[in-house]
């Protein structure tokens, strides 16, 4: 089992509100990164990971994955269908991918729990929209396993921000990690991030 990632920087985290779901998100990040790394090495679909990050993630060490996983926001995204009940009628493995189903199920369970306990953290940490939070809260637990078979329900986060993934995989200095942490802990900041990546951090 992967060890719990260390928080990025004490100063940045002390500036954040009380985020009791943060550790759970970081643990899911670590599992998700290892999952994507395996898929890269086996030449499987890597769920939208930007091309520029694939080489670095494919060869990343366990220690680097621990560091990247500690980013205080989900590195994955759930894409819930607008009408969950209709999807569930036909949900089922057309081409079974049990590992993807297991990963999706774990994230769905955690996202639903966070949505029920703290919609604010569900938005900030999981990147969920208000309508998605409402759908998850209304969904019976018995339907989560079936929903996890929905094609495309799980993707990488920040698929349009190659610079962010490159920075995550290359930033080793505390100052660089702190900049990313401060960005991640501002609600709504994701849509304001530049589409073009800034200068690379110094390794």
Where are these regions (language model features)?
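Intrinsically disordered, low-complexity linker/tail regions enriched in Pro/Ser/Thr
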Residues: 2-15, 62-97
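Extended, low-complexity, amphipathic alpha-helical coiled-coil/linker regions that act as scaffolds
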Residues: 12-22, 27-29, 51, 132-139, ...
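N-terminal interaction modules that seed assembly of large macromolecular complexes
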Residues: 34-79
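Amphipathic alpha-helical packing elements
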Residues: 43-47, 54-57, 100, 104, ...
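Long, compositionally biased
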Residues: 71-92, 150-189
